[in-house]
A protein has these predicted regions:
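Catalytic machinery of carbohydrate-active enzymes
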Residues: 1-215
Length: 215
């Protein structure tokens, strides 16, 4: 095929592999450069931005709620998000965009049905190209380790990531990540086998972090 040089990660070494550091090293070595910034700038076409603006009111503080994720052990849980949203609604003008995958739309539905103030929008039926402009226009991300926080951080939005049983490496690359971990947990020791329960991160702790970053 005329390919003169092929670069690849070492095989069978994912365990204990720091994904960000490994990618950084691989890129520097492959391109023969000294450093490779991990912060990027995510660009969205103006046409898509303008189309998404119809879902926004500038008088509100607009938060994307990342309620879905790839596995149930990494989810903070519907009850916690419901309590958090209701508490925020008692303390300010907010609007919430509930993000889950299409196969997890019951999570979005259950959350929205139990919010006293009807100020939520379900993103679960939208495709990625429709969701990204909304993420880029939001003021903040709050939620599980899911694809949305990777977009919001690179759109320079503060992103509160609730790390239950996800490695820290997944959110190590951006200053816009604000991680909340279970009580008595150590960030360096979190991984997919940690087995922390959703209630090990309190609603009050998340609420206070939102207020802190918002002010």
């Amino acid at each position: 095929a005329g390919i003169k040089k092929v670069h690849n990660y070492p095989l069978f070494k994912k365990k204990k592999l720091h994904l960000v550091n490994a990618a950084n090293k691989f890129t520097c070595e492959s391109l023969n450069i000294n450093s490779c910034p991990t912060e990027t700038k995510f660009f969205v076409k103006n046409e898509k931005i303008n189309h998404a603006k119809k879902y926004f009111n500038k008088d509100n503080y607009n938060i994307v709620i990342g309620a879905g994720s790839s596995g149930p052990d990494t989810r903070w849980g519907e009850r916690n998000f419901i309590s958090l949203i209701n508490k925020l609604n008692e303390n300010g003008n907010y609007f919430f965009y509930i993000q889950c995958g299409p196969e997890q739309n019951e999570i979005s539905k259950n959350i929205i049905d139990k919010i006293k103030k009807k100020n939520c929008m379900d993103l679960s039926k939208m495709n990625i190209s429709e969701i990204i402009p909304i993420l880029s226009l939001s003021d903040m991300y709050v939620g599980n380790d899911s694809f949305s926080h990777h977009i919001t951080t690179q759109c320079n939005k503060p992103s509160i990531v609730l790390l239950l049983n996800s490695p820290k490496a997944y959110s190590d690359y951006s200053l816009n990540h604000h991680r909340i971990i279970p009580e008595n947990a150590k960030l360096e020791e979190l991984d997919h086998s940690s087995n922390y329960q959703a209630n090990s991160i309190s609603i009050e702790k998340v609420f206070k972090k939102i207020v802190e970053l918002k002010s």
